[in-house]
Amino acid sequence: MLQIIPGLEVNPTARAAIEIAAALGAAGARALVACAGGRMEGELQAKGGVFVPFPSRTKSPLAMALNVRRLARLIAAENADIVHVRSRALAWVAYGATRLTKTPFVTTFPSGYQGSNPTALRYNSGLARGDAVLADSNFTAALIAKLHFPAAGKIRVVHQGVDRQVFTPDAVAPARVQAARRHWKVAPHERIVLLAARTRPGSGHKILIEAAGLLSRSGLAGVKFILACDRDEDSALERGIDRAIAAEGLQGIMCRTGPCDMPAALLAASIVVVPATEARAFGDAAVQAQAMGTPVIAANLGAAPETVLAPPMVEESSRTGFLVPPGDAAALALAIATVLSLGATASGKLSSRAKKHVETCFSAEHMCAATLEAYADVRRGGER
């Protein structure tokens, strides 16, 4: 079994590839991962995967054409039964190589690749050419079927999995939580509202800033708002966030910081907010926070209703978090105030339901089992 990904840097794509490699190894299969390498090579090999160096980051047409032949030779040399790819450029390379070798071809279609013009749609369509097309949510599956209709009959929903050995309260030492609070300069009596997201349009930073301003003016005290952002993104967006914080007069209660120890940050938080204004197919932060038992408030768009259960989609007794209209700072402020006012019993029940929801629907084990089932069906010819 051969997976091909851009690299083994620390990101959800590499994490998923490693989890699948481990599951394949446990099932007695040889799990190859071809890519440009990265910091997670050691973890891949420790979990039974085999790293195969491959120039997978190139996107130039000539280099991609050369990679088709290179990948076909690798497939033949390793006698790979199935090829699984997770990016657009690599999808075209793998499509060409697997047609040459007559090898089954599986793709995972990331949700962000919607395409806004014919050229983009054509480029993205490589991911829709798999013998099985894996979508990370029902939202993504519907989007693929709409934009790439020929793929509709080959789509399977395989939700991303959370590593519950990492994202569980028992795995986080109290010292890690205290270190996060010290880094953010949070006083012992203060509670934390955390937004952990990339600094990019659509992440909703300014919606939270506006909501925090409303809460501050209404007299809310004893709360610190933390924006944990990647610092390697658009600096103009970062400056815009800083200006918005200053305009609301929130410098004393809102802190923008860089990447953090995410499990510790989620456990330190009293609330995790995901106020996105653009639809995302799978919200890592929302699911990871629920795994930690931390209350989540998310914008009700994209796949949020799949990952965060809230009325009217479920009964109040089945709630695992809160959904608010996207772009509505007043609704977000009200939800934050509501969660902060929950008593210990209500908060404990919400936390237990959220953790159970993740265990049932979004575990790495669940993701791996569904993916291996897709491999088995494709190998039997069930998807071809």
Q: What spans do the regions from the language model cover?
A:
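A conserved mid-protein helix/loop that constitutes part of the nucleotide-sugar donor-binding site
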Residues: N11-A22, R191, R200-L214, A330
